[in-house]
Amino acid sequence: MAIYVAIGIRLTGVKEVLGMWIGGNESAKYWPGVLNEIKNRGVEDIMIVSVDGLTGFVDAIGAVYPQAEVQRCIVHQVRYTTKFVNYKDRKEFVKDMKAIYQSPTEELALEKLDEFDEKWGKKYASSIASWRNNWAQLSTFFKYPEEIRKIIYTTNSIENFNRGLRKVTKSKSIFPTDDALFKSIYLAMMDITKKWSGKAWNWGQTLDQLMIYFGDRISPEDLE
């Protein structure tokens, strides 16, 4: 059983939980329903979505929010990639991999990826293939300036939120029903989000950049 969480940032800079869903290893058919639920509750448009690697989720985003840009979480990608790497190689491997996603431009990142492939490709083919196959979503953040990159680069907001939820689920390992689990999770969510009164870091400059890239989709009412 898994708990799926969606967190958004309003144009006012305030974070908000958009929804939580309890399920198992969901198929690709599950995600359009989740996204349509979010849309029906009032989220009319999404500029950029930061995701991990759920099967079929990117396609579902394209169907429900066709204008949304998708950024695959770099932290999740690094974790997945290093699964295949021997311990003795890991430090050097991670250093070389970091040069890819810390490049200032996509062009330079692709050069670093080619170097990475040349050095490690024969030994860790699956790791390199993961970068190649997912590059379209891994490289989205290169389009934007630093202010926007810091927000979409990873799903850290959700990771931190989930860390708070785990304290609840670990303290009580067995729940009699899904409803009992959901109620406990909901109460934990309310406790966590009480601390979300402030705006995202450096939001004024971030909003300024968002207006440059997405201004035609933002109305004055959206900023209130």
Describe the residue ranges of each PLM region.
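A generic short alpha-helical patch detector that favors 3-5-residue windows
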Residues: 23-27, 49, 70-73, 85-89, ...
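RNase H-like nuclease fold core
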Residues: 1-51, 55, 64-67, 134, ...
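Flexible, active-site-adjacent loop/turn segments at secondary-structure boundaries
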Residues: 7, 20, 41, 46, ...
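Acidic/histidine-rich catalytic cores and adjacent linkers
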Residues: 66, 99-224
